[in-house]
């Protein structure tokens, strides 16, 4: 029995690097595809947004001589590359996936609309939504929150390298305390940087819970969906 029928999974681009310093690690990509395939086979309607930080981060472009708008546009294209890679990996698992883009770029992907994305989900296809919001100055966390709300997901799953939300950086502070659940209000008060403020506000105002968990631990995604107590729920 699955806990959620429709979800939005946010993956970071950096996580696709695996142990490499750049690009896409094929092993990590295939591990993610296997985990996502398990969900689809359980009947979970799955939307996905992937970052592009393994290829290019828009904000970092400003330090390399690009203006912010151009840098963010390059970052959007990086998310499309990652989305195409994940789509191919899913097809190798015999899972149908459709890539949507927030900027028109047919035939690379379909131009995104809420209706088309929901139609794909209802057919049991994975809807991979790329190119952020299509606008500069917005992070892929904000794009994930927006797409989760638009596609009427019950929860946004934020797959990271850590196993939840802590009171401080667990890699730097041995006394950091892990939360099983925490309210958006407390996230604000404690200044915990789970997502940027725009994304957090969007989730809070639309009553969209966020579950932060370690995606790199094989099997965790399925555990989340079958109700095992892992990660941190932000509500």
Question: What residue spans do the PLM features occupy?
Answer:
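C-terminal catalytic "cap/lid" subdomain
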Residues: 1-235
